[in-house]
Amino acid sequence: MPTNSSPEKSFLAYLQTQLPSALPQFLLQQRWFGGKARQIQSIEIPDIVPLTTVNAYLIFARVNYAEGPAETYAIPMVRISSEGQASSLRIHPDRSFAEIILKDALTDQQFLAHLLDAVANRASWPGIKGQVRAVPTSALESLWRPAEGPITPSLMNAEQSNSSVVYDKLLVLKMFRRVEAGLNPDLEIGVFLMEKSSFRNVPPLAGYIEYLDEHGATSLGMLQGYVANQGDAWQFTLRALAEYYEAVSQSNAAGAGEIPRASLVALSGQPVPDEARRRIGAYLDSAALLGRRTAELHLALASR
């Protein structure tokens, strides 16, 4: 059962009463918050989990809307001494507690380093109702060991609905912002491929973070090996096509042969003309490899 000291219990209870009125404005400023277009009716705080050592708290906020289903967000926050920092939230003082200023913990370097150590060391933290635990997999040791020294974390800015942290191009930690009871599909696929399949053309699952209460487990985040890349396949395709069209527009059409007039469906089974293949470069080989890997992934998932 979760246990906390009496002063800490009082502080957590105070946060539970104050956060519902302080959170709406904070949430509307966050890029990962999915309810910006909806009217917030009320916020409940079902649990708060103190993350020891770094003066941080994992806050679970259930957001009720005027219309439609409620959503639950997992919000790690760290207490700071002064306002004015990015993603900060202020709770005014009362007779029992001084002013409380919190900021998004994923913007805090010390917290991010602590989170990685927590996964490596199987840390767990009790909350008001449940507990959070961090679990490494066998793959973590081959990717990074704490004895090798600290690695520098950096928060990625590209994602909208979740938040990802890169650790020295060795590891990537994805924290789920909107959470639901049960195993997150991304994590479920990673666990299945690692434990039940020989398919290895995905980032290795190095660990995960979950919340446990009387209703079971809720996925909070997953740690994976970092894969060097040049962006996603869609952007890669757009760049390749732009370069192809530019090359074609500047080329001499003489000797290119007659342009096929059939539909794309009819042409899909025909070989690509040599001139077109030369102009588009290595893209077709990359697209073919992507198709093979996608098919292999689906076969691996279907083997369950």
Language model regions located:
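Short Lys/Arg-enriched alpha/beta "domain-start" segment
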Residues: P2-I40
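Charged, amphipathic alpha-helical segments
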Residues: A37-V49
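Conserved ATP-binding subdomain of kinase catalytic cores across diverse folds
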Residues: P46-R304
